[in-house]
């Protein structure tokens, strides 16, 4: 055990005390108005620089920037040879930037309101970027793919936005398993849910490059599945566990996939909390801290969208957020 892992684990536990957790998230989500929700957010680590008139987009950006800062702090404490760990956990934010850039490229033939383009400003990743901001200079979807292929992401495959983003999500799963082995079953379960969404909700064919990456994560038998139930039967146990909730639900299985998504979040949260509470100082502990930071951010984003809108039954919000 090196001093770097001890320092990063200790610092990580202190950062977790800055998250707002389920109760704080629920309070923002059930605020009577967006102004009330924004005021609550401003009193947390996510809103220290949030303008008093900020809209939801600005609030999401502020929350994301806060989490990036936390990951950068942790990266500074890691052993020099392990800097890729923080970069891997920052990948969802980089994916968000890439997807927004692809959307703008798709609309390049249309009139794009200047103020809208300004509001879509990408998240600054600093040293945590893998291919960003270079990809942001691409002027076509093919150029995006080419630039990604020359980066640590590798070629995601596909020729349109949906295919490229799918390829990157699967590639992120493989990066996670390499950098943070404790995430292996989390990644396998989440990947299986992703396959189910693509195949049986969106009805999309998964291109071969992404399919080969999927084979590495959940085995090749998913390829012959013709229904969600068939898919679950063909998955290894290490990947099929999120679907226990779906099987127990009434109604069509593919309409209950949100329960499987929730099962992934619950499992990751519970496992990661246990790891951070063991008192051990290790790569696994730091990985668990980073996972919990991402989950808290995701839940805060959900709360921002819910604040001041039609009330959602508590049990539904708890599941989705």
Where are these regions (language model features)?
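N-terminal domain-start signal
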Residues: 1-321
């Amino acid at each position: 055990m090196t001093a770097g892992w001890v320092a990063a684990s200790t610092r990580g536990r202190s950062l977790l005390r800055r998250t707002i957790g389920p109760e704080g998230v629920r309070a923002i989500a059930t605020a009577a108005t967006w102004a009330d929700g924004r005021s609550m957010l401003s009193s947390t680590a996510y809103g220290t620089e949030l303008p008093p008139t900020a809209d939801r987009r600005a609030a999401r950006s502020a929350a994301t920037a806060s989490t990036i800062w936390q990951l950068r702090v942790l990266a500074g404490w890691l052993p020099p040879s392990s800097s890729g760990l923080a970069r891997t956990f920052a990948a969802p934010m980089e994916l968000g930037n890439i997807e927004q850039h692809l959307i703008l490229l798709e609309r390049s033939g249309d009139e794009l309101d200047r103020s809208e383009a300004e509001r879509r400003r990408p998240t600054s990743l600093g040293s945590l970027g893998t291919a960003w901001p270079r990809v942001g200079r691409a002027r076509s979807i093919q150029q995006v793919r080419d630039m990604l292929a020359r980066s640590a992401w590798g070629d995601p495959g596909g020729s349109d936005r949906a295919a490229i983003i799918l390829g990157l999500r699967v590639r992120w799963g493989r990066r996670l398993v390499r950098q943070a082995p404790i995430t292996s079953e989390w990644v396998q379960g989440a990947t299986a849910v992703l396959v189910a969404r693509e195949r049986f909700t969106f009805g999309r064919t998964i291109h071969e490059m992404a399919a080969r990456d999927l084979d590495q994560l959940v085995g090749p038998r998913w390829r012959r599945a013709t229904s969600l139930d068939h898919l679950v039967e063909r998955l290894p146990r290490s990947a099929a566990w999120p679907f226990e909730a779906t099987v127990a639900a009434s109604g069509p299985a593919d309409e209950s996939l949100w329960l499987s998504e929730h099962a992934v979040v619950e499992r990751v949260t519970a496992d990661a909390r246990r790891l951070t509470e063991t008192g051990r100082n290790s790569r696994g502990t730091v990985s668990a801290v980073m996972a919990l930071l991402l989950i808290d951010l995701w839940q805060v984003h959900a709360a921002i969208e819910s604040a001041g809108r039609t009330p959602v039954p508590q049990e539904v919000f708890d599941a989705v957020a």
